[in-house]
Amino acid sequence: MSIIKEFREFAMRGNVVDLAVGVIIGAAFGKIVSSLVSDIIMPPLGLLIGGVDFKQLSLILRDAQGEIPAVVMNYGAFIQNIFDFVIVAFAIFIAIKLMNKMRRKQEDTPAAAPKPSAEEKLLAEIRDLLKEQHKQ
């Protein structure tokens, strides 16, 4: 079997394709959440606590000295990333909760009775004929 054929079979298996779609959608969702946090949530929050831009919050550990740049701890960006994480984690929690609820519904739904085979139909007809003969 050629490597290309093996790779094609591997890549087209359901789980791999589903995983690829999930990664792509997850990356896009991550960008949306980052924008939501940095552009929508953090500005009003910063305004409420005194007009602070969270991206600019930092602690200078060592000032710049000549060509050596300053050593800065950007804790504002870290706070913003925590908000990103909390929103993504909550969205994933809700999605999994909904999926589990749908899965439970499917499991609770009784399976349809299988259609009788030709033999079962024939036996049922014979039974019905015998019942009719006994009544007469």
Curated annotation (Swiss-Prot):
One of its GO terms (molecular function) is mechanosensitive monoatomic ion channel activity. Gene3D superfamilies: Large-conductance mechanosensitive channel, MscL, domain 1. InterPro entries: Mechanosensitive_channel_CS (IPR019823), MS_channel (IPR001185), MSC/AndL (IPR037673), MscL_channel (IPR036019). It comes from the Bacteria. It is found in: Cell inner membrane. Keywords: Cell inner membrane, Cell membrane, Ion channel, Ion transport, Membrane, Transmembrane, Transmembrane helix, Transport. PROSITE patterns: MSCL (PS01327). The keyword Ion transport applies. GO terms for cellular component: plasma membrane. It holds the Pfam family MscL. It is a multi-pass membrane protein. The chain crosses the membrane at residues 10-30, 76-96. PANTHER family: LARGE-CONDUCTANCE MECHANOSENSITIVE CHANNEL, MECHANOSENSITIVE CHANNEL MSCL. Homopentamer. Belongs to the MscL family. Channel that opens in response to stretch forces in the membrane lipid bilayer. May participate in the regulation of osmotic pressure changes within the cell. NCBIfam families: mscL, PRK00567.1-1, PRK00567.1-4. This is Large-conductance mechanosensitive channel. The gene is mscL.
